[in-house]
Amino acid sequence: MPSENKTSLSPWLPAFLSLIIPGSGQIILSHKTRGFALFLAFFALLGLVLWTQAYALLAPLALLLIWIARDAYRLAKGSEPSWGVSLLLIGIVLYGTALIVTEVRPTRMITGLPNVTPYLRSLFNPELFETPMKEVVGVTPIMVPCVDPLPAPNREATTSPQLILSAPCTEVGDLLQVTGAGFEPNESGQMQWIDPLGSPRRATFDGEVVTFKADENGRFDVTLLVPQAVPLTAQPAPGETLTHAVRAVQNIPSGRLQPTQTLSLVIEKIGETIALAFLATVMGVIFAVPVSFLAARNLMSGNPVTMLIYNVVRAILNVIRSIETLLWAIIFAVWVGLGPFAGTLALWFHTVAALAKLYSEAIESIDSGPIEAVKATGASWPQMVIYAVFPQILPTFTSFTLYRFDINVRLSTVIGLVSDAGLGFLVVQWVRLNRFSAMATALIAIILVVAILDFLSSWLRERIIQGRPIISSTNPLVRTVLKTVIIVGFVATFIWSWNVAQIKLIELVKGAPQGLALAREFATPELFTRPTKTVAISAPLTVPCGAAEPSTPADATITLSADCGETGDPLVIEGTGLPPNRTVSVRWVLPDGGYLRVRSNCCDTDDDGNLRVETAINPIVVMEEGQTEPARVEITYEEIAGRIQLSETVRTVIRLSIVTLLMALVATTLGALFAIPLSFLAARNIMGDTPAGRTIYYGLRTFFNVARSIEPLILVLIAATWVGAGPFAGVLALALNNIPNLGKLFSDSIEEINSGPVEAVTSTGATRMQSLVYAVVPQLVPPFLAFIIYQWDINIRMSTVIGFVGGGGIGQQFRIWVSLNQYGAAGTAILAIVIMVWTMDYLSAKARERLI
């Protein structure tokens, strides 16, 4: 449709300009936002294509350039602007490069199925309960080989049960008849051969493992082959023999069904998980409440000083929140050591920032009337908070606290991935040991714990928000007793959690110097560097004297007190004309290039660039037979050889940040593609009230709730086994996590649509599919897009940490740097994560505002 914004310019001019500089034609036509967006999009995509060397994608990029020029032409002609074709071309290039960067290879999902199959099977075979087993064992010795005279065996035979052999000695490869008596009647068992060292192996006959089943009298007869149990190199000397043994074993159920050791350990770790979450939440509230008042604009807007405090506090809270809890766990583990204490500190630190932000926003949204009324009485700031603010915010604060406790429980299940606390620690260990059934037990426990606590916290939040009392009884005595029980239970739980978390404040104090030094290194990111070259000056040293003549003389700026000598002779090394106040290295250098420092932590030049080192001749420089060139004494130092440039750390961080962003993008897209069709099947108003509809609805809703309980970090462990460690594993884990999350959000939106348009379309005789397309979908596009952007925002945060367990991205490199004590490089990664999260958070918030 023609537009009234027609320009007097020739439409070919802006089209030509946009062909030369993409977006410039739109800018001169006063479509500045559109022009800048196209400019940035084109060159960002061009950079991705060149970086990935995916030159085939230059074709759609060229088509995009032509479209940009055509768009400028149409705008100049007065046509309405559109984005359809451009978004398609941008998507082709963007997702093409993203699939390359994230190493998405669908074929690996097929070839890796044998690796992941044990995980899937184990979910149906968890180690929950077992029956105690009684072991019935019969053993009898036998000599191999036979000798004359035959010595007595050096081990005793059992008498009940008893094994009787067809011969007291035998040879390797012979058949041996074994009769058993006194065994458990009508029970099966297995035969074993015990070598002289006591190591058992399965007995065989005709290539099959020998088993037996005792008759009603507890007797059996079997034949087995005498194995080569002793290596040929360890055979006894002629005339000597070794004592072997034949062993029969029955494992018989004995006693009642009882929890397995795995389940008992999981239950113990469940308590630890809840304790960490509870303690972190309680301590977080204690610190977050006062901080939240300092972060509330309506309470701090009185003067420039309070506004400065407000801005500083807000900035600090945003930085802390931008860094995922697992990153904090690594940092605190360096500070106070591995263990529950480090995990609790990480949860607490992040909880303070998260709750303080939520609390401050609640404070900013309160009614200002009571505040003004209290201020008018001349009340102080603390009085205003107590009498005008607290009564309004207490219900909201309580609701936010329960919500955060729910989050902390989920985080506590994975905090063990970087420490030895919580259920996550068990999951990691069992995955590494290929104990899949034990891992399944832990996963089931995580799902149940999260689901139960999620239900309880949701129930409490609902009652608090609705203003309904938690204790519904009106009997004063009952209410008093229940309140007392709650208070005593809270205190007891706090003490128990404190002990479980192994809180040792003295360790925090002892580690403070190291922690502060660590903080300084993290706060000094490695942003820039200058190329250097190594400068070396040297002088020959012949040991012993007269052994050889050096072919290269000494440099003019280095002198030795002696040109030759013997091992241990004193030697003074002097250097002149060196850079002043510079650390240099002084070393013995061998003709083959090997070297040894003269002294550790050596040495620094003085203000005039002079150096003097007193030492003794080291044995390493003694000339060997056939050696024609003596060793040398060398002074080396680094000299700047170029301009300031971005450090290699920054280059690595930028590259991995792009990988992280694209991982989040691909995972969000895959999750949305699968979640959209499933969400319609999980919406009650779409599925109807038929038996089949209800079955599908409840089945999918249950799947969503169960799958959402498993944290992406645990899914990464499985995905890394499936397709191999790397970005693809991270994408796969995030996508699997996104499907239930987005599916639930989408289905809730579908259930909340306006029924009016649906009824209107249905009344025309439209089918269910037509009603869906023309009455339902138009209402769902804005909220669906908003949820997808919201999930992408979450995925960006998660992408920064899933690399800890094989998911690729910047998190994997961060952990490597920390493990190598390269905290400056790790600080650079932290800075990049904060910038990335802040930027994407801002952009996604703006996008959601426009959509909603």
Question: What feature does the model see in each segment?
Answer:
Residues 29, 366-369, 373-393, 419-421, ...:
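Short helix-to-coil transition segments within interhelical loops
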Residues 1-12, 31, 46-282, 286-290, ...:
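N-terminal, non-cleaved signal-anchor transmembrane helix
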Residues 334, 406-446, 465-466, 721, ...:
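Glycine-rich helix-loop "coupling/hinge" segments at transmembrane-helix boundaries
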Residues 267-275, 279, 313-320, 406, ...:
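Alpha-helical membrane-interface segments at transmembrane helix boundaries
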Residues 306-348, 687, 693, 700-735:
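Generic hydrophobic transmembrane alpha-helix motif, especially the helices
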Residues 380-416, 437-449, 453, 457, ...:
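Transmembrane alpha-helices
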Residues 287-290, 327, 342-345, 349-371, ...:
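Membrane-embedded alpha-helices of multi-pass transport/permease systems
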Residues 10-63, 404, 412-416, 426-451:
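Hydrophobic alpha-helical segments
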